[in-house]
Amino acid sequence: MPLTIVVADDDLQYREIVRFLLAAASDTMIIVGEAADGDEALALARRVRPDVVITDLVMPHLNGIELTRRIREELPQTRVVLMSSYTEDAYRLMASDSGADVFVSKQVITSTLVPAIRDLIRRRFSGGSGPPTIGGSSASAQA
């Protein structure tokens, strides 16, 4: 059964990049919905209950941090990948504090998104609870 994914970003170009990366990666990941803002993403996630939500940090109506918090509260089995053009440590910490499983920098998204999702799912199904993957390496290595 393929991994179901919701993609949320107000920038259509990044939604298209994510769509391309996941399609090229394999047929084991399928996008079941896309949203252009946080409110739309939350409603979609509630409806389809995806395995993973990939969300931008900065979006209208509900930002990625608040979206992540709400997903954690309402859909605890759903994993969250937070992506952003901001790379400063403060944003990585906000992502981690909000409950995001993975933080991916948009500057390196083409090389880090799919491996980060695979690592996340591997840890989830192996029962591992290691630190969240952030841009392809563990959070403890980033600290």
Residue ranges of model-derived segments:
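Conserved sequence signature across two-component system core domains
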Residues: 8-9, 35, 53
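Acidic catalytic/metal-coordinating carboxylates
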Residues: 37-40, 63-66
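Receiver (REC) domain active-site loop signature in two-component systems and cognate sites
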Residues: 59
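Two-component/phosphorelay signaling modules centered on CheY-like receiver
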Residues: 12-33
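Active-site beta3 strand of CheY-like receiver
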Residues: 48-54
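Alpha4 helix (beta4-alpha4-beta5 surface) of REC/receiver domains from two-component response regulators
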Residues: 66, 87-104, 108-115
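The C-terminal output helix
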Residues: 118-138
